[in-house]
Amino acid sequence: MTSRTIILRFESRNGQFRLNVSPQDMFPSLETKILEHLPPDTEPSSIKLSNKPIGAAGDERFLNTLDGVSFEQVGLRSGHGDKLYIGYQSKQDLQDGASNGTAAGSSARRLNGAPINQEITPTSRAQADRVASVTVKNPWDAVRQSALDDRLEKKDGKIHRSRDNKMCKHSAKGMCDYCMPLEPYDPKYLAEKKIKHLSFHSYLRKINAATNKPELKSSFMPPLSEPYYRVRTDCPSGHPPWPEGICTKCQPSAISLQPQEYRMVDHVEFSTPDLINSLLDFWRKSGTQRLGYLYGTYEEYDEVPLGIKAVVQAIYEPPQVDEVDGVTLHEWENEKDVDEIARLCGLEKVGVIFTDLLDAGRGDGSVLCKRHIDSYYLSSLEIAFASRLQMQQPKATRWSRTGYFGSNFVTCVLSGDEEGAITISSYQASVAAVEMIRADIIEPSAEPSVMLVQSEDDDTNKSRYIPEVFYRKINEYGVSAQVNAKPAFPVEYLLVTLTHGFPTESKPLFIDSTYPIENREVIGEGQEFHSLARKLVSHGDPQKAIRAVSDFHLLCFLRTFSTFSKEEEALLCRVATTQNPTDGLQLINTPGWATLVTILQDSGERPPKRPWLDPSHPVPQPGKRYSPSSRHESPRSESEQLAKRFKGASLR
């Protein structure tokens, strides 16, 4: 029996053509047929296929690297007229590229001239995310979401109510409108509990109830879709790509800003107040601001229906230049190492925190209140900063058409309140704000309370398309009216507020916090060998050493030694988080720990120098008393010692 065939359309810069193929055929089998429609001097090894026009951020694969991949494996099994884009290079172009010492196109080659397999070439996270949308027909079926989201999906989510003795007229086992369970998105319940935003899973159930109806037995459609405010490069109309051409199918629609009704995370919980005090100590000692990244976990939050909270266990302070009115971040070279230590401890990067403090000058520790209802809560520059960080930490969910939606990344600010006390405020940038930053539609303003809308006439990027942006406000007549957002609009439309707090009983993951924090040399606090030796080897007590490693900053510093293997490093992090004595004894008997102790003993703590002792007298040994003849030669006080040192250094 002959197998059925499907029609595939191909488009290159040389034109368009069609081919009849079998769904079971492999991609490399098309090489001969494709070459018939390309110029005679085309290099066969340079042919690549993409789901989007070449160079338009599609998933580009070289044809010779798709050996063993059939058409039906990538979803080309039943439809007719599916379109693929072809890129190629001539042999002359490849020769010119080689003579100039550059690789032709985007292909990489080995020393023998053979092309490198693109599947083993390292790719960025964004490129890896796009692969799923091409090789898998439904990206939401292949995405792997967090275990917390899986647990919340299995929950009933209903808000159970007890029997109302005044209104309920039924028996104890009956139910009526006054005692039946409520949906997690019930507006009356949220207003009663003063919950400003829906939790993510409550919002998900609200929109899914309108999108997918099980009683209709229809196919599943993800109810979530991230906003897209950029010109689509894969327009099916056939016109030249933007900026040469545009149509109603590929241009973004007008944007109507409105406050976001849900939030991805509902609460930020700091495991211990020491985390905040440690960050504040830098401001108290230097008078400048400080920024740190929050490492912790996401857990269920029972105060909100189907809520999520970020539990912070550690704050890592990256390299930065601190100033009175802000910070300037430097390149964070060991970010991957810190993330790996956090992963071994069961943590992940959950947010960022920074200070914005200015002493009130009263001498009582009070600070100025700079953020309030008449000024701003998060400036336009800080919203842009938070949006870019959320962009780097997308949330994987099977309820989105792209497999990703929003972000769980939070932003916290330490600033003064109306009473002059230091308080924490937690926020997230809205999903619309993240996409507007990604599309380069908005930019921060010198006025912190407003965000500027970009102009298409900007000389730096003439190919940018800026859609119309509107927002609603109460006009002078007391009526809600839609207003054009150009040139600027209030930042409140891009913000989502979160709650914060501390647990009633503090149970931090790391029980030791005495080791110096990284990148604090400017205030005289550095991570050095002698301080590490004092904590781990100088006291000679293994149990104290086991307790001392329960410090996130110390773990990150130990990774710079490279003395532990992967298994030993995992054991080290397990001891730091569980403080298990059995694992601790196993740790101190590993070769990596022995190497570390040797290094610290050779270059760690040294006996203190006593320059006032006479050179003819031997240096006193530890545990021995000074002889009477040596006691009278030491100075009577530190001031006398300092005076003698200055006298010896006198020029007269």
UniProtKB/Swiss-Prot annotation:
One of its GO terms (cellular component) is nuclear membrane. PROSITE patterns: MPN. Transmembrane segments: none annotated. InterPro entries: MPN, Npl4, NPL4_C, NPL4_Zn-bd_put, Ubiquitin-like_domsf. Pfam families: NPL4, zf-NPL4. The keyword Amino-acid biosynthesis does not apply. CDD domains: MPN_NPL4 (cd08061). Residues 630-643 have a biased composition (Basic and acidic residues). GO terms for molecular function: ubiquitin binding; ubiquitin protein ligase binding. GO terms for biological process: mRNA transport; protein transport; ubiquitin-dependent protein catabolic process. Residues 97-108 have a biased composition (Low complexity). Residues 268-405 form the MPN domain. The keyword Nucleotide-binding does not apply. Residues 95-127, 604-652 are annotated as: Disordered. Keywords: Cytoplasm, Endoplasmic reticulum, Membrane, mRNA transport, Nucleus, Protein transport, Translocation, Transport. It is found in: Cytoplasm, Perinuclear region; Endoplasmic reticulum membrane; Nucleus membrane. It is a peripheral membrane protein. Involved in the import of nuclear-targeted proteins into the nucleus and the export of poly(A) RNA out of the nucleus. Has a role in the endoplasmic reticulum-associated degradation (ERAD) pathway. Belongs to the NPL4 family. This is Nuclear protein localization protein 4. The gene is npl4.
